[in-house]
From Swiss-Prot:
Name this protein carries in UniProt: Transmembrane protein 201
Subcellular location: Nucleus inner membrane
Functional summary from the UniProt entry: Critical regulator of angiogenesis and endothelial cell (EC) migration. Promotes the migration of endothelial cells, which is essential for angiogenesis. Interacts with the linker of nucleoskeleton and cytoskeleton (LINC) complex, which plays a vital role in connecting the cell's cytoskeleton to the nuclear envelope. This interaction is essential for maintaining cellular structure and facilitating the movement of endothelial cells, which is critical for proper vascular development. Involved in nuclear movement during fibroblast polarization and migration.
Keyword Metal-binding set for record: no
Nuclear side: 1-213, 319-322, 375-644
Annotated positions of the N-acetylmethionine modification: 1
Amino acid sequence: MEGVSALLARCPTAGLAGGLGVTACAAAGVLLYRIARRMKPTHTMVNCWFCNQDTLVPYGNRNCWDCPHCEQYNGFQENGDYNKPIPAQYLEHLNHVVSSAPSLRDPSQPQQWVSSQVLLCKRCNHHQTTKIKQLAAFAPREEGRYDEEVEVYRHHLEQMYKLCRPCQAAVEYYIKHQNRQLRALLLSHQFKRREADQTHAQNFSSAVKSPVQVILLRALAFLACAFLLTTALYGASGHFAPGTTVPLALPPGGNGSATPDNGTTPGAEGWRQLLGLLPEHMAEKLCEAWAFGQSHQTGVVALGLLTCLLAMLLAGRIRLRRIDAFCTCLWALLLGLHLAEQHLQAASPSWLDTLKFSTTSLCCLVGFTAAVATRKATGPRRFRPRRFFPGDSAGLFPTSPSLAIPHPSVGGSPASLFIPSPPSFLPLANQQLFRSPRRTSPSSLPGRLSRALSLGTIPSLTRADSGYLFSGSRPPSQVSRSGEFPVSDYFSLLSGSCPSSPLPSPAPSVAGSVASSSGSLRHRRPLISPARLNLKGQKLLLFPSPPGEAPTTPSSSDEHSPHNGSLFTMEPPHVPRKPPLQDVKHALDLRSKLERGSACSNRSIKKEDDSSQSSTCVVDTTTRGCSEEAATWRGRFGPSLVRGLLAVSLAANALFTSVFLYQSLR
């Protein structure tokens, strides 16, 4: 130890370097040990390729796991294929069967899925299953031309197994209705996104504070204008000059023979006492600066104009304000007046002095306002009104998974793959529909069905009797028996009649629509597909669903279908029963909710074109209520007119005040 101490006393730097070396070696050893013995994570978060849901799985199963949400297998190779064989893809008996037993649920909740037997007949449903099986068993002649051959084969199957006319009419009606709802969702999302962006821009621009150099430049411009105003008021009388200092220069065009009396005005005596408190050399410098500025007023005006322009450039486009632009215009006008006075010299008229003084006073007032108001920005302050949809405030498009579309399993049964999933019609019961009250019509039942079952828009919004468009859409008091789930008639909502029940109904049957749907496609305007809307690459979540709820797969026997499998069934007459008191109260509440907008609907519906609009096309209706009559000149020009009158009043008051002060002080 004594030897080590003597060595450290002889070479202190060697001891310090040795300590640092030992510390570095220890740290490197600890780091290498941690790297060598690093523990792999036990679990990791993965994302499902099919339903885009995140799931926590063991680390070893990060490329081979089953999604608990959609029950799909996630395990892929580099070429995109599965990394293990899945026999359920080509063996039908390995697929699990979906239970058709009705689940115990709240009867007030709407039915999200309908039976395929309601939309397609038995023959068309069998044809769809056959097409899927034949397309799945397709083997190309040449593997390199698989895409071309499968497209040709698919077209051949479509031509061979066509839908019948009633099924085709029902499918097209569903597609049309879904297009309307999707267009309304997309447009509403765009308008809300635009409103949120404008609000964010307004908050951002109003909260941005001007930099310090911009505030200093505005204050300097105000001081220059105040100096010009003070010179115009007191420059000729010499109130700021003490008796022994340098005499003040007279303004251009002033009378040099008038010698001011230094002891006649009490204000001048007060200024002399104030200047007497300053040191003598400082007072001399101030008097020299006063005389220099009074003799070079044009240069001071040019300096003020340059200061305003520089402040606007430094502030930038976001902090650009109207008051800064107005102040710059006043400085430019003041510079022009001074140049005109120098050009005219002794022949300058008297009104030019009055105009110059008025402009200087107004510029001083505006400059003071611009220098003080440093936080209020007026960039995108003006808000443009957005387009509203009927019933938008009442929750027309809720964020509940009412429009969720199921993702069928890859290995699912072929029959369940082709079951259509129409949208939920709960928003149609919640919104305020523009409809006219019921009116009795002498038209017959076949005529009303012929008009209602056309593929185009409904020509008339009035319905007689029950007002139901389809034979399968009737109140639950006429259709449902004991033990069945009551369903309501959403197509009665579409047609403008009162709903028969607060619950949505299944898809309509299309019996009797063969004759009405044959020639209607040629005379109707084509629908705008939702895919044509340009979202500019934004990810639009149309069908959000809560994380704890998974969409259920629809079944072909969720609802009671006819025993013989046919669509065209005759319903036996039923004795009308007295509905329960709770159902009557609920129906009355829903009826009063739907009749809120009937006062203005009588006037607005008459203006609609029967060939291009429908009673339920909430997308084409872009105003709320009777907005066409409410948008008068008061709503359009009211704010602008008030602002214009206020600006004219302020300008006139400032002008007359400056003229009065100038005349009284002169």
